[in-house]
């Protein structure tokens, strides 16, 4: 009996070998083919680390004039993701991290994720430009409910490490998030939070420029205000004490005048 079973087993192995390339046993043929083109950016080597991010954040309010807002961009959180959406760095501009808005930590992460996730190599998309598109009656209504923030990335008001290396996600559709580029290749996203969304955008813009990571030769992703620039599907609401490029543009419309 043992001899019979041994013979049957040998026959099965020989038959299996004959179904593939000569002399091989076929395994896992149902697996999909792998892409021959690797990701154009891996890891966090193409974006600022925490040591570089903090001075970029601290120096931004003094560059290119007043940034406006409630605190002139001086109490802020910043987050950076890589091209793959993984969180690479967190920074806070104040020495006491808890002196900033605690809620801004998660918002900064989500802004970085959104800017990276909605931009491509040929077309940057700031979170500010998603504002009108994501309102009721517009084509991206509901987008803010997509890609919820990964709870494994949540941290306290002084936590600068939780979430690093993870895809944190989150979707924010107001100012403060910008995609990062090396030439014409998207390498990640930057998110800033801690003031009005208009000032958040201004601080992020200054940081990206100072880091040399602004897109080259592409359509603008700067913030647009209908009250100043005219109607646009990419328009953002005015904020209290709104500045752009160091020039005051106006204030947010009071609620009783809507």
Kindly give the residue locations of the regions a language model identified.
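Bacterial N-terminal signal peptides that target proteins for export
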Residues: 1-8
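C-terminal motif of bacterial Sec signal peptides marking the signal peptidase cleavage site
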Residues: 16-18
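Bacterial signal peptide processing site
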Residues: 20-22
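Flexible, solvent-exposed loop/hinge segments and secondary-structure transition points
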Residues: 25-258
């Amino acid at each position: 009996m043992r001899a019979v079973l041994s013979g049957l087993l040998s026959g099965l192995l020989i038959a299996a070998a004959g179904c593939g390339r000569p002399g091989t046993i076929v395994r896992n043929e149902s697996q999909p083919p792998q892409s021959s083109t690797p990701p154009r950016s891996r890891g966090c080597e193409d974006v600022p680390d925490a040591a570089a991010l903090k001075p970029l954040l601290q120096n931004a309010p003094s560059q290119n004039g007043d940034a406006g807002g409630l605190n002139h961009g001086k109490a802020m959180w910043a987050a950076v993701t890589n091209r793959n959406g993984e969180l690479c760095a967190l920074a806070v501009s104040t020495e006491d991290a808890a002196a900033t808005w605690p809620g801004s930590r998660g918002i900064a992460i989500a802004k970085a994720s959104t800017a990276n996730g909605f931009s491509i190599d040929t077309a940057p998309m700031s979170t500010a430009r998603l504002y009108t598109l994501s309102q009721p009656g517009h084509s991206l209504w509901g987008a803010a409910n997509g890609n919820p923030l990964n709870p494994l990335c949540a941290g306290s008001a002084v936590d600068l490490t939780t979430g690093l290396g993870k895809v944190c996600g989150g979707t924010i559709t107001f100012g403060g998030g910008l995609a990062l580029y090396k030439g014409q290749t998207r390498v990640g996203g930057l998110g800033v939070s801690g003031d009005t969304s208009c000032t958040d955008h201004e601080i992020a813009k200054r940081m990206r420029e100072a880091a040399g990571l602004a897109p080259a030769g592409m359509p603008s992703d700067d913030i647009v205000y209908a009250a100043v620039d005219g109607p646009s599907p990419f328009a953002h609401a005015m904020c209290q004490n709104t500045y752009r490029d160091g020039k005051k543009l106006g204030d947010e419309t009071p609620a009783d005048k809507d």
